[in-house]
Amino acid sequence: MCAPLFQPAIIQSVLDLDVYKINMMQAAYRFYPQTQVRYELIVRSDDNLSDLVEEVREEINRLAELRFDAAQLAYLAEKAPYLTAEFLSYLETFRFHPQQQVSVGIFRTAQGDCQLRVTINGIWHETILYETLVMSIISELRNRRYWAQIPQSQLHKVLEDKLDFLDSELKRRNITNFRFSEMGTRRRFSFAAQKTMLDVLRARVPELLLGTSNYHLAQEFNLTPIGTVAHEWTMAHQALVAVQHSQCVALDKWLEAFNGSLGIALTDTIGIDAFLSDFDLEKATAYAGVRHDSGSPFVWGDKIIAHYESLGIDPSTKTLIFTDGLDFARALDICEYFAGRAQISFGIGTFLANDMGNWTNDKGIRYQPISMVVKMAECNGSPVAKISDEPEKAMCEDIFFLMNLKQRFGLEVDLDKAIETLKQMKRQQKKRIQSVA
């Protein structure tokens, strides 16, 4: 019997994913229909997920049963008018083929521990939706296995306490520029927890809630679906065009894909300084705003505003969206700092969708969400990288490609660090000890 915060089948709708995945799917389908990609699961926290391998494989294989039905396609046509009729016709025939596209197994880390491995291979637009779904599956399976004793009342209590704090602080500090979207799908405690949380938010703070990044829940609760683009769009272009032009081409192609709609640029694939070098007057004018996802939000925002001003653009006409590991306290500090200087918005995920407060189990261990990502590792057989404005978020499997990428964008290359990284990579070669069934 499943606890109230869990359900027998985790993904029950093909729309139970992030909006930006379908946006990028259309762009990849249009511009790069034969491009091959590989994604890898990266577990950043200390959680050993290898015991879940069979359950993860089973849930991923169930994705083959999902379809875009007529009602869902009609909903997408209404709520996302930038999706073309041709693309929606393609979605009508779209199928997941997890047994051919996804390998689930175990590898041994450099420390000798076992860890879950999930690798996704295939044509870009045919595999792009797996990321959100795989992460949701892993998070819920882990919590169902080890944290099923957490009652729904704990989630309610944590949420109500947070919303009480928010209400109090907004009044005390007279903050009027705070609005946010819920973006917790990938790292949620469970589907039921995310649904419960959204139900609470729309009842308590409807005037502050802009929408959700989850298409299925947006449809169910009549909320606005929110989302634009992710790092993988820029990362893929590192393998699709000359690497020094990759960011510019990615920015231009995104505008072309949606005729200027969805004009929020993500700034930290290479890093904020490299981004601003490519974000010229034409692009800065065409894009409605930019999104922060790593590094200091205050330093970042100051740089963005100064850049707009240097181009003769009034920053108050542009939107700054913050999405990096936010809670309400941090978001309100950002609101105060940038009040009157630019339009501000927030995307908040784990803090709302996967926080159980100070809940501890009978062994005295406090609940913590998994820290994990599923990121593109290769495009057309070539490595790709995310450098980020926060070293812990940097990702690349090939140190030589990373050094070349940094050099091409005028970033400092630390040779001593590169040599040490090569030594570590040699020690940390992943060894498969269980292959896909």
Swiss-Prot record:
Post-translational modifications reported in the UniProt record: Transiently phosphorylated on a His residue during the reaction cycle. Phosphorylation strongly increases the affinity for substrates and increases the rate of nicotinate D-ribonucleotide production. Dephosphorylation regenerates the low-affinity form of the enzyme, leading to product release.
> Is Ligase one of the keywords?
yes
One Pfam family, please name it: NAPRTase_N
The UniProt keywords, alphabetically, are: Ligase, Phosphoprotein, Pyridine nucleotide biosynthesis
Query: Looking at the record's lineage, which domain of life comes first?
Result: Bacteria
Pathway participation: Cofactor biosynthesis; NAD(+) biosynthesis; nicotinate D-ribonucleotide from nicotinate: step 1/1
Q: Any S-S bridges, and between which cysteines?
A: none
Q: Where is the signal peptide?
A: none
Task: Give EC number(s), comma-separated.
Answer: 6.3.4.21
> Its catalytic activity?
nicotinate + 5-phospho-alpha-D-ribose 1-diphosphate + ATP + H2O = nicotinate beta-D-ribonucleotide + ADP + phosphate + diphosphate
Q: Does the keyword Lipoprotein apply?
A: no
Q: GO molecular-function annotation terms?
A: nicotinate phosphoribosyltransferase activity
**GO cellular component terms, A-Z:** cytosol
Which residues in this protein are found as Phosphohistidine? 231
User: Its function?
Assistant: Catalyzes the synthesis of beta-nicotinate D-ribonucleotide from nicotinate and 5-phospho-D-ribose 1-phosphate at the expense of ATP.
Write out the similarity annotation: Belongs to the NAPRTase family.
> Which PANTHER family does the record match to this protein?
NICOTINATE PHOSPHORIBOSYLTRANSFERASE
Q: What is this protein called?
A: Nicotinate phosphoribosyltransferase
